[in-house]
Amino acid sequence: MRGILLSIIGAAFCMGCVTAPQSRDELKTTAKNHPSMSIAETHTANRRFEDVAVTLQSKWRECYSVQVTTTRTTQSGMTTSRYRDSFHPRVRKVNNSLIEMTLQMTTEGMIMLSKVPEGGDYIVALDIVRLSGNKTRLDWYSSAWGWKDGWEAAKQWGDGKNVPCPTG
């Protein structure tokens, strides 16, 4: 998770002219419009919508309901900064064919330079979409930095594989 945090910070510096998304829809639009800096991909799982939804909701909460504390120290051991990031996984059933999963992050102990939306910065949007037959589509939107492993894990969970939480 610490690697993911550093990736997010790095992405913020690299994306200079891209403002932080203020909504889930803005996160999706930003990911689609900046493919070199984002992941906006789709995966089709050969499993029933209900089965995929149960698995992903369980893993979403297990893997992403975390807090990460970062402490920076000098070579002499003096602490120069300490802050805590809390990740907030959210799940919303839109209808019988769509579930929206959103990951937001709040930071304590650090001055944020950009406006932070209610609930925290938008980190990941994952849509679970019912397809015909026993198939389900996953639509993933995030920064490319630090989230490739998260997307790979989500695809495998969608396929019914029991892989561990990504470590970032």
Question: Each predicted region: which residue ranges?
Answer:
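Positively charged n-region of N-terminal signal peptides that target proteins for export
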Residues: 1-4
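Compositionally biased amphipathic helical and low-complexity segments enriched in hydrophobic
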Residues: 6-7, 99
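Processing junctions and N-termini across compartments
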Residues: 8-11, 159
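C-terminal motif of bacterial Sec signal peptides marking the signal peptidase cleavage site
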Residues: 13-16
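Ser/Thr-rich, low-complexity intrinsically disordered terminal regions
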Residues: 18-168
